[in-house]
């Protein structure tokens, strides 16, 4: 890896003079990107899952279509390294990394990590997210650049950057702090697929997945996940809205996934101002439920709280035939009367109320 260019700046403002912001730009080869991995390793031919959701609704996909729908890859770092040796690492491109640590976080209890693909750039700078980070003592970390922003291999690439940034920021806890992941569109190739391999992740978000089949990750089933679709997003309509929702419902039914999804009415492929409170509610509630209150990543790896299906609430899924804003029933797991196997899993009653309000009103108005 070539020597990198590092810019470090203390944000000298009247209110928060000790906030830390670090920026680093590296040139990385394209062999790290998921596109290269699909094209140059054996994962494209794997059949860990056949891609069939409901033959009664959509028929049996062709063998080629089924393989293309399977993103549940089994690829070791050694196999990836061998493929790079045989095929070459490809051209190099810039990848920019940014870290922000609030003054209040003398020890960061967690890191919100986001791909800068799409809306990730704006999320990193969002005032409300930074307010939450100050309150919960979280660091924010972002990366953008073709070798990584749509997902990457190997997973250690992120861990290496977090460790390096932790050393330079004098926040060594970044080497072990729990992670919350965000990916927009095909940035889902980061947030969903990375979650399947990391015991450090306390929750993850896929915002308007470009390819919804990327979220079919059985190994991530027990990590709380949120998928948000835009009702008029062209990607949501391919091949159909029902089939895209069906990917999440299949994970719920086949793997008891602790996941929920929402459909934001009258919106397209990008989130808006009313979308972010939905994400922030999920971040807050999952952090409280999974990250121990006395966590200290300076002492090493953090053991996150495991959650059970029965401990949460359930919510009736959005009706694609009705469309628009809908009042969807929620109830504790034991008393929910709908289809428990496919309903959205909601971490607690307070989060369930936010989920319900968002689907009914298109926004969360409580504070």
List where the protein language model places each region:
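A domain-start/cap signature at the N-terminus of enzymes
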Residues: 17-110, 182-194, 356, 360-367
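The feature captures the conserved acid-bearing segment of alpha/beta-hydrolase catalytic domains
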Residues: 202-280
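Gly/Ser-rich "nucleophile elbow"/oxyanion-hole loop immediately N-terminal to the catalytic nucleophile
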Residues: 104-107, 151-189
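Active-site machinery of serine-nucleophile hydrolases
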Residues: 110-111, 117-160
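Alpha/beta-hydrolase-fold serine-hydrolase catalytic core, especially in secreted/extracellular enzymes
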Residues: 256-257, 265-367
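Loop/turn elements at helix/coil->beta-strand transitions in domains of secreted/extracellular proteins
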Residues: 106-111, 136-141, 175-179, 198-204, ...
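Cell-envelope and extracellular/periplasmic
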Residues: 115-118, 167-170, 184-186, 195, ...
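Sec-dependent N-terminal signal peptides
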Residues: 3-13
């Amino acid at each position: 890896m070539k020597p990198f260019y590092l810019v470090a700046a203390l944000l000298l403002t009247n209110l928060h003079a000790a906030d830390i912001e670090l920026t680093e730009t590296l040139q990385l080869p394209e062999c790290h990107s998921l596109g290269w991995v699909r094209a140059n390793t054996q994962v494209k031919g794997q059949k860990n899952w056949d891609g069939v959701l409901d033959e009664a609704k959509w028929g049996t996909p062709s063998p080629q279509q089924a393989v293309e729908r399977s993103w549940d890859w089994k690829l070791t770092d050694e196999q990836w390294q061998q493929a790079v040796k045989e095929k070459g690492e490809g051209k190099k491109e810039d990848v920019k990394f940014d870290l922000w640590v609030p003054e209040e976080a003398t020890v960061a209890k967690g890191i919100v990590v986001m791909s800068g693909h799409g809306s990730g750039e704006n999320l990193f700078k969002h005032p409300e997210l930074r307010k939450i980070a100050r309150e919960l003592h979280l660091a924010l970390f972002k990366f953008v650049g073709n070798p990584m922003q749509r997902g990457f291999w190997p997973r250690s690439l992120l861990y290496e950057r977090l460790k390096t940034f932790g050393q330079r920021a004098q926040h060594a806890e970044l080497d072990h702090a729990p992670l919350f992941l965000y990916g927009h569109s095909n940035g889902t190739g980061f947030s969903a697929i990375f979650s399947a391999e990391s015991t450090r992740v306390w929750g993850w978000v896929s915002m308007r997945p470009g390819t919804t089949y990327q979220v079919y990750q059985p190994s991530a089933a027990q990590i709380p996940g949120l998928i948000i679709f835009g009702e008029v997003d062209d990607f949501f309509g391919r091949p159909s809205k029902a089939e895209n929702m069906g990917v999440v419902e299949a994970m719920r039914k086949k793997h008891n996934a602790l996941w929920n999804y929402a459909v934001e009415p009258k919106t397209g492929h990008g989130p808006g101002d009313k979308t972010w409170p939905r994400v922030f509610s999920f971040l807050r509630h999952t952090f409280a439920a999974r990250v121990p209150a006395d966590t200290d990543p300076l002492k090493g790896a953090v053991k996150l709280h495991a959650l059970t299906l029965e401990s949460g609430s359930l919510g009736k899924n959005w009706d694609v035939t009705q469309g628009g804003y809908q009042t969807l029933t929620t109830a504790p797991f034991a008393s929910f009367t709908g289809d428990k196997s496919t309903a959205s899993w909601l971490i607690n009653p307070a989060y369930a109320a936010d989920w319900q309000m968002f689907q009914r009103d298109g926004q969360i108005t409580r504070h």
